[in-house]
Amino acid sequence: MSKWKAKIFDISSIGIADVLSSGIASIFWLYIATTIGPEKYGEITYLLSIATLASGLSLLGSNYTLMIYSAKKIQIQSTLFLLTSIVGFVAALTVFFFFVDIGLSLIILGYIILALVTSDLLGRKLYKTYSKYVILQKILMVVFGIGFYYILKEPGILLGISLSYFPLIKELIKRFKENKIDFKLLVEKKNFIFNNFALNILGTAYSSLDKLIIAPLLGFVILGNYSLALQFFTLMSILPTVIQKYIIPQEATGNDNLKLKKIIILISVGIAVLGSTLGSIAISYIIPKFETSEEIIRVVSWAIIPVTINGVYYYPKFWAKEMNRHIVFSTTTTVSIQILGIVTLGSMFGIFGIAISLVIAISGGVCYSFIADKYLQKYS
């Protein structure tokens, strides 16, 4: 098999899984949004943001660490699985104490299991196995999520989603049998792991804090519209996300893929144009209850360009060189600008201010990555 054919085959394995899983998830959330309306959808999103925050902190950066070290055949899986599982259980119990919602607590554990297993599989370049689990989880999410909704109403959605993650436990058990627990590795790799932990905190803050701020600031109806727009943005992000998952392990083992990176960045420009024009019209036509989402999508679609530049060009380079502190600083820049933007621009311009702050924030993160990359080229 030629080099490019092999690349296309591997990318297709990841791509089919991510396209199908994102498509299934989007249909699921569109159905839920249409059924329960903007306010209830905003409330569900708010609770999921809490689960995202708790699981992100509990991961301790293990997902990024696993993807790199599994690719480099460093046997750290069992150690990270054990440590993360303990912290995850503590987080789940703490959240249950405050919210008394078993579904919410189980989702925290589910998020952790999914992140650990998929990161390890991608690092090992087991793309077919990755595809199988990702698609299976989304199918189960639809079956259980909708099924439990009609039994328990809104709380049933969270419980159903949480149950969809547990088939992945099989892979966790398999890794425990294959590798010995060795805490010395954590000490040896502490700087890289710590930077990944910091990155995980920032990534979690980026994906959840905006929703936790918007809810008390502008209400659950606005949050519901914003969350639906982000669901559409996630669909737009499928291609760069797939390529990033392919490139990171490749870059870690010395394959640059520069031509592929340039092609994907150019494609992202076309995606941004289509999202800003046709996408915004489509969402208001499909779900008229969420007409405010049209304005958000028109703006946030342009964020796909800086997301792609960072995701497929800069971040894989930083990870491969174990210079992930620059990803930490880039993400810090993004999170700081976005929070400031939501509080200031959101208060002044409402939904438009929130949307524009996202684009500015992600662009700010890319600016930092550009400067850091130039610095590394000059002094390395």
Enumerate the predicted regions with their spans.
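Interhelical loop/hinge segments that connect adjacent transmembrane helices in multipass membrane
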Residues: 1-3, 7, 102-106, 124, ...
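Membrane-water interface segments that mark the loop-to-transmembrane alpha-helix transition
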Residues: 9-21, 46-100, 253-276, 330
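Short runs within selected transmembrane alpha-helices of multi-pass transporters and secretion channels
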Residues: 21-25, 29, 47-67, 104-122, ...
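Interfacial/gating helices of multi-pass transporter permease domains
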Residues: 27-53, 192, 196, 212-234, ...
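Membrane-interface helix-capping segments at transmembrane helix termini in multi-pass transporters
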Residues: 35-47, 72-84, 88-111, 150-158, ...
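Helix-loop interface residues and adjacent transmembrane-helix termini in multi-pass membrane transporters
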Residues: 35-38, 124, 151, 217-220, ...
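Specific pore-lining/lateral-gate transmembrane helices of multi-pass inner-membrane transport
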Residues: 69-83, 188, 225-301, 305-315, ...
